[in-house]
């Protein structure tokens, strides 16, 4: 037997918040702010957005490791936050997130049509998220009422290590019966999500405008003037540079053109690992 490069894509692995649902990725961000506030520690929306894409416990740990947040915690409690403190914040975060997730469950405009176009091409739809399963179960149920059902879902606590490690993306490959990781594309609005796809050996597509990086509602995004939008795209592209996404697009509605381009590159013998 000989190895043969795949010549067409078999699967997309889609993130959830900021990619398919919750334009601007508001659900997790606001809850981080509220969870810290219950411990009398102020965290801004901008600070809360920083580690987005990681599993939520890791996200809180990363926030607590930031010097300015650690100092606020020290002033409130007389010590810097330990792992036990992180767990306490996480345990408050979880019920708040479950309680309020429905407020930010709308599908991103055009997502359903885009996914339908991919399925017509025989492309399977895997998915993963920085949410734990307890939250994902509710997110998945809400999305189903709006017409979106992924072929597979992997929550961050269903693998040994979440993003930026590749386990969630690779769990989708196994569950979907994909022949080769190079026949997959990971689509995400965060740096950890793009690193996940890169480390899994997949093609990667970073979303610049629908998710955490821009942090606007769909209406606010549509209202941006051309100069501001161009400036924001440039800022966000620089943010993603170190994770080396193969493509950067505004929203999931731009994905079909990318899929066509990747298929053409695969047909020429190109592989994601060599780019």
Swiss-Prot record:
Acetylation among keywords: no
Broad class of enzyme this protein falls into: hydrolase
InterPro entries, per the entry: HAD-like_hydrolase_sf (IPR050155), HAD-like_sf (IPR036412), HAD-SF_hydro_IA (IPR006439), HAD_sf (IPR023214), PGP-like_dom2 (IPR023198), Phosphonoacetald_hydro (IPR006323)
Keyword check for Metal-binding: yes
E.C. number(s) listed in UniProt: 3.11.1.1
Residue sites binding Mg(2+) per the record: 15, 17, 189
UniProt-annotated catalytic positions: 15, 56
GO biological process, one term: organic phosphonate catabolic process
Catalytic reaction equation(s): phosphonoacetaldehyde + H2O = acetaldehyde + phosphate + H(+)
GO MF term list: magnesium ion binding; phosphoglycolate phosphatase activity; phosphonoacetaldehyde hydrolase activity
Binding note for cofactor: Binds 1 Mg(2+) ion per subunit.
Alphabetically ordered keywords of this record: Hydrolase, Magnesium, Metal-binding, Schiff base
A GO cellular-component term linked to this record: cytosol
Superkingdom: Bacteria
UniProt similarity note: Belongs to the HAD-like hydrolase superfamily. PhnX family.
Cited PANTHER family: PHOSPHOGLYCOLATE PHOSPHATASE, PHOSPHONOACETALDEHYDE HYDROLASE
Protein name in the entry: Phosphonoacetaldehyde hydrolase
Lineage, uppermost ranks: Bacteria, Pseudomonadati, Pseudomonadota, Gammaproteobacteria, Pseudomonadales
